[in-house]
Regions:
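Active-site-adjacent substrate/metal-binding segments within catalytic domains
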Residues: 4-163, 174-207
Length: 208
């Protein structure tokens, strides 16, 4: 055993209440702007959007308020994988004995393709029926309290973004000699592929 090990569902529920007290109203500390930029550095032109700028020969990200931004993030935030239970349901007595859990299995984010996403199921047990919204807000609060200023790639999209996030922009991969499936920025079609990939995110145009 170890400190903090979850022993039963009741403990999950209690820890859910603690999470809400600790993180739902959390903010970045006073050295950060509301976007996670460093406010103790020289302020540059504030455009209202993230951008890049060469400062003393080095390229920096500048946040919408004009502060230098060093991205510190975690990839894959808020996701879980399914455990397959098809034809072996008898091994998962917690599901058959937990009426609420069984009902929640109708939620496709918990139960699909003959498997159970225990990550999401335990979030339901921890936070209740509004688990998706509470989990998002608790996660955002954790980031701010821990001074993590970026949702990295492959993270779940925030419904109301308050933490900067990254988007995945890909171009076609080609074979170059013995090197397979690589991106060639010197390929004549690279700019076209990049532009087309960026256009798939045009709904983010007005997001800082």
């Amino acid at each position: 055993s170890w400190d903090g090990k979850v022993e039963d569902v009741n403990q999950l529920n209690k820890e859910g209440e603690i999470d809400k007290q600790l993180y739902l109203k959390a903010t970045f500390n006073q050295t950060y702007s509301k976007f996670g930029g460093y406010i103790k550095t020289k302020k540059h032109n504030a455009t209202g959007f993230f951008r890049t700028q060469n400062i003393d020969g080095k390229w920096w990200l500048i946040d919408p308020e004009g502060y230098k931004f060093w991205s510190t993030g975690i990839t894959g935030a808020g996701k879980g994988n399914a455990t397959k239970i098809l034809n072996k349901e008898f091994l998962f007595t917690d599901l058959s004995n937990d009426k609420e859990a069984s009902i929640n299995l109708q939620n496709k984010k918990v139960f699909k393709r003959g498997g159970v996403n225990y990550y999401n199921l335990n979030l339901f047990r921890k936070y209740g029926s509004d688990w998706e919204n509470i989990h998002e807000q608790v996660t955002i609060g954790r980031y701010k309290k821990w001074n993590i200023n970026t949702f990295g790639a492959w993270s779940l999209a925030q419904k109301n973004p308050s933490i900067p996030y990254t988007l995945i922009v890909s171009t076609k991969k080609i074979n170059i000699g013995n090197v397979e499936h690589t991106i060639d920025p010197f390929d004549s079609n690279f700019k076209i592929d990049l532009k087309n990939s960026l256009l798939t995110h045009k709904n983010k145009t007005n997001d800082p």
